[in-house]
Amino acid sequence: MWWTSGSIRNNPRAVNPFLQIHMKIFCLSLLLLLFPACVAPWTKAVDTAMRDEMKQQELVGLAVGVIKNGRVEYLKGYGWADREKQTPVTRQTMFRWASISKSLTGVTAMQLWERDRLDLSRNVRDYVPEFPEHNATIRIRHLLSHQGGIVHYTNGPVIATPREYPHAHPFENVIWSLNDFKASPLVNAPGEKYSYTTRGFILLSAAVERAGRQKFAHQVRDRIAKPLGMTTLQPDYQWKRIPNRAVGYRKRDGKVVVSTDTDVSWKLGGGGFISNIDDLAKFAEGLLNDKLVKPTTRAKMWTQQKTNDDQLTGYGLGFSFKQYEKGELSSWKAGRTAVVLVGHSGAQEKTRTYMILWPAKKMAVVVMTNSQHANINKLTGRLLSIVWPPEPSR
C-alpha cells in the first residue's frame, strides 16, 4: 500500500499521514470548543437588544447584519417569516428592500457614468424621449438627487396614461412603467429644491436601461449582484414564486395582522427589489470596499448635493446623507468628532428596511423586517449604539 512505502519506513523524520489527519481533527475540535469564548461581547448585546425591540414594537420578523472593518461580522434572523405557519426568520428569508432599491439604481447609473455611457448633465429626454418635455430640462443629476420635480405619491396629481398592453405583467418593461405618471405635472422646477420621489427613480432606471443597452434588472444582476455574490437579489414580482419570501404584517386597530400583497413591479428602480439579509450585507460591504465603483466615483456619489441656490439637500446621488457634528450623536457614541453617515431606508407594504454606512470606519449596519409598523429608526439607532466603535482616549 502507498502509505507503507519506503519513504516513511526509512525516514525517521517522516510523519505518518494518519497521524497528520488525527492532529488536524484534534486541532479543529479544540478550535470549535474555544470558539464561543472568542465571540465578540457586542454580539450578545446585539442579540439581547434586538429581542427586546421585537417585544416592545410587536415585530413579527427581523433580520440584522453588522459590517465592521469592511467585513461582515454578524448576521442573524429573529421571529417569524410566516407567523401563521410558524416559519422562522433565517438568513435565507427574503425581505423587500423598498427604497433601498434606489441605491441600486444610483450605483448602476454611476457605473455607466464611469464608462462615459451616461452623462449626468444631459437631459433625461436624450435617453428617454418617451418622457414629455414639460417645458423643463430634467438632468440625470437631478433625478439622482431627488431634484427633478417628478411627482411622488401625495405631493401632486398623478396622471396615468391609459393604454393596452400585450403582456399580463407589462411593468417588467421600465419604459412602460413611465405611463403610470409621465403625464403628471412637475411639482417644482428641476434643481429648485429637494423633493423625494420614487417615480423620479423609475424615470432614472429607464435612462439607465437605454444608456446601458440592457434591461435595467439585468444590469443590476450583472454589475452588482454577480460581482458581489448576491445570489438572492431579484425583482419582487408578485406573480413569480420566490422561495423563502416573508409574509408581511401591519397593525390594525391595535392588532398585528397580515399585510396586503401589492405589485411593486412598476417601481423596480425606486422600490422593487427583494433579497435575504446576507445579500443586503454584501451590498453594504461591497460599497465600503469599492467593489462596485472607483473610490473617486464613490466620493462623488456620497457627496451631499445642492439646489440651484446652493442649499444642501441631505442627499447624494442615490444615497441619503447625514453629517453629525461634534457631540451631536451622543446617544450613538459619536463623541468628540464629526461623523458622516450615508445609506438609505425603505418603507412600503410588508417591510421596513435600513442600511447605514460609516465610510470612514468601513462600518455598516443593515436591518430588514416584515413588520411595516416597525419604528426602524429607533431599532437601527439602538443597534448602532451597541456596535459603534469606542472613542479613542484623549
What are these model-derived regions, one by one?
Residues C38-K76, N155, E209-Q214, H218-D222, ...:
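Catalytic loop of the DD-peptidase/beta-lactamase superfamily, centered on the K-T-G motif
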Residues P129-T137, I224-Q234, Q305-L312:
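Short, mixed-charge aromatic SLiMs
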Residues W2-W3:
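Tryptophan (W) side chains
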Residues N10, N16-V89, F95, Q111-D119, ...:
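N-terminal leader/targeting segments and the immediately adjacent pre-domain N-terminus
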Residues Q234-P243:
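Short, surface-exposed recognition loops and adjoining beta-strand edges that mediate ligand/DNA contacts
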Residues W80-T198, G212-Q214, K240, V247-V257, ...:
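Active-site-proximal loop and beta-strand segments within enzyme catalytic domains
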Residues V64-V66, G70-R71, R96-D119, N123, ...:
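Alpha-helical scaffold elements that line and support the substrate/ligand-binding pocket
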